[in-house]
A protein has these predicted regions:
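Extended acidic/polar, glycine-enriched regions
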Residues: 1-18
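Active-site environment of non-heme Fe oxygenases that use a 2-His-1-carboxylate facial triad
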Residues: 13-45, 50-233
Length: 234
């Protein structure tokens, strides 16, 4: 089985309206729900517009898909600037492109960032199609692609507010049994020391460096600003 996923790049910004769907349309009609789900399944990104801006007001919408997964970050997880942060999300610093919780055995299937307020300078969002980058490597840098698929990386979360550390080994690019893309794991902030055979280390460093550079290349990336009431779904 090969999914109907549509790879995209920076040109998606020129058709940004095509990935937007109204909150009330999703909440009140199966047609709106299907439109949202197809965007997520086929494109991997969607912006829900004109949602309420009260805390937890997105839950009725999310429950149209499934239950919300609980984590130790609390539900919902608030992306705010706090003193003595235990996570880079709790700072005003720009975040590099990454995927969340790569040290989970099963990282989130979908995530939803609900913008309640965005009045500060900066605060723009970005999106990158990791599968498009993987496809580029598959077609143009096969040795690097194979390294990213075949050599597991070590991810670890060491949070000073938690009693335990969490870690997991997984490749940067995972494939299904049919050779289709399954998931991407990229997070410099939670990548641990390399845990591979010494003969592979130089090759792994080279592969991960190129992968990271391409994941931040403008030709694969879109940038936009979330407005209050937007829900960034991916």
């Amino acid at each position: 089985y090969i999914s109907p996923y549509k790879l995209w790049n920076k040109d998606l910004k020129n058709n940004f309206d095509t990935i937007c769907v109204e909150h009330d349309e999703i909440l009140n009609s199966d047609e709106g729900l299907i439109k949202w789900l197809e965007l997520l399944h086929h494109t991997g990104i969607a912006i829900v517009k004109n949602a309420p801006v009260e805390e937890k007001s997105a839950f009725p919408l999310l429950n149209r898909i499934s239950h919300v997964r609980e984590t130790f970050f609390k539900t919902p997880f608030e992306v705010i600037n706090i003193p003595k942060p235990n996570n880079s999300a709790y700072t005003a610093h720009a975040l590099r492109n990454h995927m969340d919780l790569p040290w989970f055995e099963l990282p989130p299937g979908y995530q939803f960032l609900h913008c309640l307020i965005n009045s500060a300078d900066g605060g723009d969002s970005s999106g990158v199609d990791g599968f498009a980058v993987a496809e580029h490597l598959k077609n143009n840098e096969r040795e690097i692609f194979d390294t990213l698929v075949n050599v597991p990386l070590k991810f670890r979360d060491m949070d000073y507010t938690q009693e335990s550390h969490r870690g997991f080994h997984a490749p940067a690019i995972s494939l299904t049994k049919d050779g289709d893309f399954h998931d991407i794991r990229f997070s410099v902030a939670t990548m641990d020391v390399l845990d591979c055979h010494p003969d592979l280390m130089e090759k792994v460093y080279k592969a991960h460096r190129l992968f990271g550079r391409l994941l931040h290349d403008e030709k694969f990336q879109i940038n936009f600003r979330l407005e209050p009431g937007d829900i960034y779904s991916f």
